[in-house]
């Protein structure tokens, strides 16, 4: 039987447990497969999948949830257009709502989007903020710009189109976290206003909280914790934000954290009346954001745990 015939016969299959192993032990290793219907005999042009150390040609991963030939109920009963093309995909409602999930964990889901130049302290603030929320009994998760490229976005380059897709994917995943009731902390350079605005538009009004790390370029370059500015100045990295690619600072974000050699750290919020801070401590930085969340009703119930954010 040729590959095309096999593809017609086999709709879906999964990697079964190895001989002698229990179903539950290998459950996490299941992968749905799809056989390619291509008849191209060129091995170099075919896709392959490695299973238990062996290469299987003309097989590729695919998403198991597909609406083709399925009748799925939706709120509108209409199919959805994706990228301008009609798809047999409709929304399926669930009786457990976002409000139900938020009531269960006693907090409101939202996205805290930390933006700024490389070396401005985005990841450090994200970790300190996550610890501060954890100490208050609040559930959060960090989507770090570097970390997501190890998995979710490992197929993307740093070309313009792929950088835009990187932001789009993180925005969509952050939206899902917020919908689950989790406080999602996304820390990415995200240099362009239009891309940050697109992510904001994914969420209900007020659930996208933009935090701008307003740190001067010369300060970030002096820190250069990853050596990226040095490589960019030497011409080894092209299109590096702040060197040969622009960073568009937010014009109307919720929180601004500024850092200068003379004044240390200060903060301002466009939507709250919290006083500014003059400490450069990570805990103080995290408290600026926590105070905003508290004042705007995202933290429904306080914890008596320590305020230590590290």
Swiss-Prot record:
CDD domains: APSK (cd02027). Keywords: Amino-acid biosynthesis, ATP-binding, Chloroplast, Cysteine biosynthesis, Disulfide bond, Kinase, Nucleotide-binding, Plastid, Transferase, Transit peptide. Its main location: plastid. It holds the Pfam family APS_kinase. Disruption phenotype: No visible phenotype under normal growth conditions. HAMAP family: Adenylyl_sulf_kinase. Homodimer; disulfide-linked. This is Adenylyl-sulfate kinase 4, chloroplastic. The gene is APK4.
């Amino acid at each position: 039987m040729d590959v095309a015939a096999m593809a017609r016969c086999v709709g879906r299959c999964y990697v079964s447990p190895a001989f002698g192993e229990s179903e539950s032990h290998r459950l996490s290793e299941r992968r749905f497969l799809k056989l390619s219907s291509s008849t191209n005999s060129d091995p170099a042009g075919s896709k392959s999948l490695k299973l238990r150390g062996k290469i299987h040609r003309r097989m590729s991963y695919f998403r198991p949830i597909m609406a083709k030939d399925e009748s799925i109920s939706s709120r509108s009963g209409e199919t959805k257009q994706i990228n301008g093309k009609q798809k047999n995909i409709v929304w399926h409602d669930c009786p457990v709502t976002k409000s139900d999930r938020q009531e269960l964990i006693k907090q409101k889901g939202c996205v805290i989007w930390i933006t700024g130049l490389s070396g401005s302290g985005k990841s450090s603030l994200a970790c300190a903020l996550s610890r501060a929320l954890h100490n208050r009994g609040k559930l959060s998760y960090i989507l770090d710009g570097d970390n997501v490229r190890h998995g979710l976005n490992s197929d993307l380059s740093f070309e313009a189109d792929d950088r835009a897709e990187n932001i789009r994917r993180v925005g969509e995943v952050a939206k899902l976290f917020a919908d689950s009731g989790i406080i999602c902390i996304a820390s990415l350079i995200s240099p362009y206003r239009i891309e940050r605005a697109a992510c904001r538009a994914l969420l209900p009004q007020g659930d996208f909280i933009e935090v701008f790390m307003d740190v001067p370029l010369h300060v970030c370059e002096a820190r250069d914790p990853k050596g990226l500015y040095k490589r960019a100045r030497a011409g080894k990295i092209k299109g590096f934000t702040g060197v040969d690619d622009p960073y568009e600072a937010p014009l109307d974000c919720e929180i601004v954290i500024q850092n200068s050699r003379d004044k240390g750290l200060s903060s301002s919020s466009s939507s709250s009346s919290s006083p500014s801070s003059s400490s450069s401590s990570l805990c103080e930085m995290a408290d600026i954001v926590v105070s905003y969340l508290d004042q705007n009703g995202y933290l429904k119930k306080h914890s008596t745990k320590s305020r230590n954010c590290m």
